[in-house]
Amino acid sequence: MKSLVLKAAAWLSDLRVAIVLLLLIAACSGLGTAIPQGEPAAFYHERYDAAPWLGVVNGNQLLSWELDHLYTSNWFLLLLAWLGLALLLCSLRRQWPALRASLRWLDYTKPRQLSKLAVATSLDTGDSAAALDQLERQLQQQGWAVRRQQNRLAARRGVIGRVGPLLVHTGLIVFMVGAVVGAFGGQRLERFLAPGRSLELLNPQGDTRLELQLDSFAIQRDPAGRPEQFSSQLLLRDGTGAPAQPAAVSVNHPLRHRGITVYQADWGLAAVTMQLGQSPLLQLPLQTFPELGEQVWGLVLPTRPDGSDPVLLALQSELGPVEVYGADSQQLGLLTVGGESQEILGLPLRIADVMPASGLLIKRDPGVPLVYAGFAITLLGGGLSLIATRQLWAISESGRLHIAGLCNRNLVAFADELPKLGSSAITGAPHDAR
């Protein structure tokens, strides 16, 4: 039984297994990008039953495979746990022992031991003890840690590079933990707010965590009328009775406040202010009409007191114009925002104003600090991994200086430098062993 556990641990800690898992998780994450996430089941049936995804996967299959919430699906979390376990075992079985071994001083006492190392050389010297002293001074000047004994020395440099792989594994594990915490503990809310309206965000106890009030909303358009930027001026209240704090949010410039991030995600039209005949100004809510286009808002308005002869008012921008259609789908007229009234089926209509609405995306993700920390640790570990760890041993014996060394990076360059280092120790000339 013990041997089976050890074999399983050895297989799980294999670097090739971790690489395959990383590629598989990356491919699955691509699926989550291609397939909309978190929509109602009816959305997937409507979209993929008639036209299956990639011509194969219909709505039922997509839902049964949990592709509608891929990042919190059981099989995706299992892949993350598997990768985390593989990295943990690899760190414990390989990286940690390698780090501990690099911190131990190895004492080679005989030249024959040095000759078996990856890089070794032996040089004639008139005074091997003096050459060893000179070599010690050179190594210390170049930043090597040196341990000297009577007729031999050991030196090392760049040991911190051994910490790099361990930090990379730790960072990836922290990153995955943060992703899981965010997937289960995070909250996401999309709302359209009209100016003057507010939205309360409650904590788990039902108390007001944050109140957002839209003070104003502006849409910047290019000469062709296409929206280029839209921004919201908000008032923030934290539920403690403190004065409201003004804040701004726009596209690519989110607002972060007490663990909550507010994005400017969309825009819409909330209401139209109009006059019917000699009536006072009336503010009527608008609704979307997807069957007329992607961004078309409007309302159905009766033109008679008994509710008969309705007309459809449709518009695509807060700037207008407002198109008026009859029950037979024929256009009856165009109304200018802020312009003069026009008679439609005997009823004078005037559009005074159109109120835009701000589409806000509100996220709370408790896993973000862990994700950022994981990225930082991984980057630090990757940088440290580039530092070459070099070890060197030298023994003076019978007029000869025996030098050998090990290096985990660019061994060829180290093999070229080692004889030069020994020669400079013999002649007393300085040599920069990088």
Curated annotation (Swiss-Prot):
Q: Where in the cell is it found?
A: Cellular thylakoid membrane
Report any Pfam family annotated for this entry: ResB
Name a biological process GO annotation.
cytochrome complex assembly
Bilayer disposition of the protein: Multi-pass membrane protein
The answer to whether UniProt assigns keyword Transmembrane to this entry is yes
Alphabetically ordered keywords of this record: Cytochrome c-type biogenesis, Membrane, Thylakoid, Transmembrane, Transmembrane helix
Membrane-spanning residues:
15-35, 73-93, 163-183
Chief localization class? membrane
Q: Which PANTHER family match?
A: CYTOCHROME C BIOGENESIS PROTEIN CCS1, CHLOROPLASTIC
What is stated as this protein's family in its record?
Answer: Belongs to the Ccs1/CcsB family.
Q: How does it assemble?
A: May interact with CcsA.
Please describe what this protein does.
Required during biogenesis of c-type cytochromes (cytochrome c6 and cytochrome f) at the step of heme attachment.
HAMAP family tied to this protein? CytC_Ccs1
Protein name per UniProt = Cytochrome c biogenesis protein CcsB
**Lineage, please?**
Bacteria, Bacillati, Cyanobacteriota, Cyanophyceae, Synechococcales
Please name the gene that encodes this protein: ccsB
